[in-house]
Structure formats: C-alpha cells, structure tokens
Amino acid sequence: MARFIFITGGVVSSLGKGLMAASLAALLQARGYKVRIRKFDPYLNVDPGTMSPYQHGEVYVTDDGAETDLDLGHYERFTGVPGRQSDNITSGRIYQTIIQKERRGDYLGATVQVIPHVTDAIKEFARADTEGLDFVLCEIGGTVGDIESLPFMEAIRQLRNDLGRGNSIFVHLTLVPYIAAAGELKTKPTQHSVRDLTSLGIQPDVLVCRCDRPLPEGERAKIALFCNVPTEAVIPALDASSIYGVPLQYHEEGLDEAVLSAFGIEAKDEPDLTRWTEIMDRLENPEGEVTIGVVGKYVGLLDAYKSLHEALVHGGIANRVKVNIRWIDAELFEQEEGGIAAQLEPMHAILVPGGFGERGSEGKIAAVRFARERKVPYFGICLGMQMACIEGARNTAGIAAASTTEFGPTDEPVVGMITEWMSEDGLQKREAGGDLGGTMRLGAYDARLSGNSHAATIYGATDISERHRHRYEVNVHYRESLERGGLVFSGMSPDGELPEVVERPDHPWFVGVQFHPELKSKPFDPHPLFASFIAAALQQSRLV
C-alpha cells in the first residue's frame, strides 16, 4: 500500500509548495522509491484550460490530454514521471461530478452535503490509481485559512484515519520573515499558521520554513517547541540560485530523512544525487553564453511561459552554456516604426511561442520575417509555427492576403480551425467528432518526419510523439505554394493530413512545430529541439 504525504502551505501563497513537493519526490526517487505527485486545486474552475494566463500562468498538458496546473510541470521535470488526468483535481470538477451524480439519482434521495459527499469524492480521487507506488505526494493549493480549501483539509484529516497511523504524514510549508527594523527572523507567523492548521484537526509532522537567510538553531528549537514537532523536523528552506539546486539543498537540510523518520523508516543508504550535482555543475560553470529573444503575448507574467523558460534552460544545460532570455512584447513591433531591428539585432536566436488571439500577431509575423531575412535561428512553437507559415505565404509564396480564420474571415485561410479546411472545391467542414477529433487538439499525438529533414536529424528518428494544445492548424492545401516559397513541410500526422513540422533548408536553423516540445523537456533529459536550438544560437553568437 502506498504511503501518503500531504503538503500544505501557510502565512502567504507562492512559497514554493510545488517545488518542495517535486524536490522531495526527487529525493525519495534517488533512494529507490516509486513516487507520484498530485495537486488539489481549491478553485471552482473545472480545469485551468479557460483561465487567463495572467491569473493562472501556463496550462500544463499531459500525454492523456489533461489541462492541468503548472505545478504538474515541476513534478514531471523533477521526477521524469509523466503526469496524468488523475494527478490534478479542482473543486469545480469535484462539484461537477457530485451534481451529475445527484441529477442521475445516484444518492437515492439523500441530502447532498460537503461532509460526507464532497470529502468522500476528494478522498476517492486521492487514493485512485496508486497501485505499485511507495509514496503519493498530495499538494493542497492555496493557504491554510482559505475558505475554498476547507473541504480538502477535512478530507486529508479523514484520510489519515482511513489510511491508518504510519501510512500518512503532513508536511507544512511556512514563511519565517526577516524584520529589518528588529534585525531578526520572526517565528510568530509560523506558530500562528500551525495553530490554524491544528484547529482543523491536522498536526504537521514536518515543518519547512522559507527564509532568506540561515535559520539560527535557537529559532529552530523555538519553532519545534511551539509547533509540537521534533527539532530535526524543522527544515530551513533558503532561496536558491536555481530551482535545480533545491533538491540538493533540501537533502543537505535533512528533509528526506525527516520525512522517512516521520514514517518510522530508517534512512540507511545515501540517495544517488549524481544527476542533480551534474546539472548544477553545468549551470554554475558554463562555457559560453547566448541571448534568446522570446517574442510573445503574455510576457507580463512569466509563469505563462514556465515550461518554455525551463526548456530553454535545459537546452543550455545540454550545451553547457548560460541562456539569457529577453522577453519581448510582440505588440511593441506593431507600435514602433523601426523598433524591430533595435530589439532583435542583439539576439542570437528568436523564438515565438504558443498563444491565442489576434493581439500581437503582426508583431510576431514581423519577428519571423526578421529571423528569416537576417538568417537568425528561429523556433516557432504552435502559434509560432502558424505565424511562420503566414509570413512565408505573404512574403515568399506571393499570397499577400494570407491569414488565419482565428482572427476573422479571410480569403486565404493558410491557418484554419481543425474542423474546417480550404480545398480546391471550397471550404470543407469536418465534424468535431470525426476522425480528426474535437475542436481542441489536446495531449500526445504521433507525427512522422521526412527522413532527410533537419527535424529528423535533430530527433535522430522519423516517428515521434509530442503533446498538443490548439484549435487551429496550418491548412495542408497550401502546402505546395508554401514549399515553392522555400518552407518545407517536414513533419506530418501519420495520415498525412495535419502539418506538424515546417523548416527552411536554406536557413541555418528555422523550425516551426505545431506541438509543444517544452512540455516534455527535463533538466536531465533536455528536449532535442531545444538542445539543437541553443546549439544554433551558440553558433550564431560566434558570428556576431
């Protein structure tokens, strides 16, 4: 039977519960245990798929097509365990399920209440699909005291009894702030947070204390005394120069040993942290430096591109170079005459990421043109590939009116909804439930690369599988025109209907992909496209 680790947070939000959960899972993995991490999100949205990137950050997509919290990206990057639909639940989905059951009469006329119906649904989710695991780590979103999280707190309190003593523990992450006027760290917020937690019937077994400077032994002992935990179970969590140094830091402070001790497990052998020390060696001792210009729409909140940021870092790790990322608002290129060159000339490579909507699209197209004409390495992801196709259609294929139906009616739909295509016979509609699936293409799909293509060389294979999240596709009926203009369709869906990869053979490095390769990149296994892209940027840096 799997043991459960429930992770809660207190004092303030954004302390790093997700990173702590991912790091702890990585440490347990390094000791030979099989782990899985889950996220409980108390918000009432069914999933984050329709939430604003400015509020929620990126939507992380799993192989099975789940639209999930960005923390699942951390979990997968740190452990290498692919996330699943069963690893993320929201209050919205819980209530949706319960209401559907009530409407069907599944409750046989009973009064449906938070206890037991909501809490039972949460417990059922937590315990599902855990066969063969040693540890299941469950992160509770939000902060202790939030109204939204109360049903989840009650559910995990009940789970401790359901699982039996010794089969679950509680880890609580808090803030120990430094008050400059007093010249000391203050433990009172942590004490109050634990008091709030115990008032809900939950006594933490391990306390992880975020602080910006070392936690003195006296303060550590004070926290242990007032919060009713052993001193060795009070774990300082200092700021780190890189998130990939966090597992090493937590191990040094004894987090994994404290967790095993709370379960009554003796930590016999040291964990194998070789790959984490190697990653940090490459990050701290780079042999070069590149600057990547990311021309996007949501640059006001970098969490909107979290996986992309990390994948670029992974590309740097693969090449042992430091990657500097310049986030550039695509709308700037629509407002400032001649501003493109000033912004992009210092860049060693240009990337246009995914996104939705018309705002900033002409700026992205201008960035594609700059990269194509100046022979600067270009990487287009999802919308970035579509913009590359529209730019190519307009400027190298002679289709001046080329556009996408996403932005409105157009006479030249080079990009269109998955359910509609332009052929020689006119606009063709495909049913949402047909062979091509629904209007949102989600999750992992296979693709086939041309054997002599740049993409196949990068992958070292011709059959690949990548994750998608999009409603629009490049219209395959424009393939011949675009290829005459030098933009080659080097990757297609297995049935040959959906373009997956485009490239320019006459360019040093120009690749567009309809999928999201950043979702599968890991620090110890960088995605080949990002490794190759950063290598091309490094080559470009030596030319300027």
Curated annotation (Swiss-Prot):
GO MF: ATP binding; CTP synthase activity; glutaminase activity; identical protein binding; metal ion binding
Record-linked CDD domains: CTPS_N, GATase1_CTP_Synthase
Chain residue ranges for the region called Amidoligase domain: 1-265
Record entry for activity regulation: Allosterically activated by GTP, when glutamine is the substrate; GTP has no effect on the reaction when ammonia is the substrate. The allosteric effector GTP functions by stabilizing the protein conformation that binds the tetrahedral intermediate(s) formed during glutamine hydrolysis. Inhibited by the product CTP, via allosteric rather than competitive inhibition.
Annotated catalytic residues: C382, H516, E518
Residues noted as binding L-glutamine in the record, renumbered to the chain: Y54, G355, L383, G384, M385, Q386, E406, R471
Residue numbers binding UTP: S13, K186, T187, K188, P189, T190, Q191, K222
Annotated signal peptide: none
Gene3D superfamilies: 3.40.50.880, P-loop containing nucleotide triphosphate hydrolases
Protein's pathway: Pyrimidine metabolism; CTP biosynthesis via de novo pathway; CTP from UDP: step 2/2
Record-stated family: Belongs to the CTP synthase family.
Subunit structure, interactors included: Homotetramer.
Annotated protein name in UniProt: CTP synthase
The gene coding this protein: pyrG
